[in-house]
Amino acid sequence: MIIATPEVQDINSFSRLESLQEVYGILWVLAPISIYVLAITIGVLVIVWLEREISAGIQQRIGPEYASPLGILQALADGTKLLFKENLLPSRGNSSLFSIGPSIAVIAILLSYSVIPFSYNLVLADLNIGIFLWIAISSIAPIGLLMSGYGSNNKYSFLGGLRAAAQSISYEIPLTLCVLSISLLSNSLSTVDIVGAQSKYGFWGWNLWRQPIGFIVFLISSLAECERLPFDLPEAEEELVAGYQTEYSGIKFGLFYVASYLNLLVSSLFVTVLYLGGSNLSIPYIFVPGLVEINKADGIFGTTIGIFITLAKTYLFLFIPIATRWTLPRLRMDQLLNLGWKFLLPISLGNLLLTTSSQLLSL
């Protein structure tokens, strides 16, 4: 059977069309993910610059100033330097665990950004259990640290990995109980719904005023989860050289460095979403005729304003963990565990009980 030439051309053009549709579908999926990763990377560079400038101000010294004006590109220069460092492997360690550990830590933290609503219409995955997805994913990162410590075949690294796992377990429970209290107030586990519930009552509807005890517990627990001073025992230089990072160099060491600041940024973003109203400014925009509220703005303008408000709240809040790092001394391991199990856990349980009682009485 001979097929006519026009029919063959039609079949070829149809197959090309299907191939183009498949390519466009892949690009449609990869484009927002790539934009998110690029934006998050820029956000990390900004945090590194902010920390260096704030720490310089606290210590009354000049911060980075040689790599571009005001040292803005200093973090990028440091990252480029790490890329060209030699990638060393421990001679008697487990090379598989040693190599996989940093990747697990970074990927687990990056996935947490998928449920953060940067604006009302801008969230990568609006899930009904978004806030619990963040808690579940963040629990994977310490596994990567433990794998890194075990695979290094170094007693300091292994002890640092054990400390990271113990610290994460100790402070994840109070943090989860604080999140449960917020979910009870909002009647939802979706991050978008939690932001929307706070916007109903304006500035005074922020969960910061309705959950002051939970906010303090969440702040302390998130600092411990990020392993920031005074909770940086897994990598205490005076005790463990560099903890689970002792045997790392080059890009793998850079991954741990990036993971630390990614975790700090995502924790600050969740503080903004859970307690500071998210993308809602809660005051009218006086430059728009008719006093149109920013919260009700639609389209590109509303999305842009929402992103700006979210990031402004986040970076203003970041001053607290940065200033804390350069002002408070490191806790001992027994003090850290006592603070988590004997102090924060009972307080967070009591806060959850009070929140549940108030919700039942309001029915």
Curated annotation (Swiss-Prot):
It is found in: Plastid, Chloroplast thylakoid membrane. The keyword Amino-acid biosynthesis does not apply. GO terms for molecular function: oxidoreductase activity, acting on NAD(P)H, quinone or similar compound as acceptor; quinone binding. Its main location: plastid. The keyword Protein transport does not apply. Keywords: Chloroplast, Membrane, NAD, NADP, Plastid, Plastoquinone, Quinone, Thylakoid, Translocase, Transmembrane, Transmembrane helix. GO terms for cellular component: chloroplast thylakoid membrane. GO terms for biological process: photosynthesis, light reaction. It catalyses: a plastoquinone + NADH + (n+1) H(+)(in) = a plastoquinol + NAD(+) + n H(+)(out); a plastoquinone + NADPH + (n+1) H(+)(in) = a plastoquinol + NADP(+) + n H(+)(out). NDH is composed of at least 16 different subunits, 5 of which are encoded in the nucleus. NDH shuttles electrons from NAD(P)H:plastoquinone, via FMN and iron-sulfur (Fe-S) centers, to quinones in the photosynthetic chain and possibly in a chloroplast respiratory chain. The immediate electron acceptor for the enzyme in this species is believed to be plastoquinone. Couples the redox reaction to proton translocation, and thus conserves the redox energy in a proton gradient. Belongs to the complex I subunit 1 family. HAMAP family: NDH1_NuoH. This is NAD(P)H-quinone oxidoreductase subunit 1, chloroplastic. It comes from Citrus sinensis (Sweet orange). The gene is ndhA.
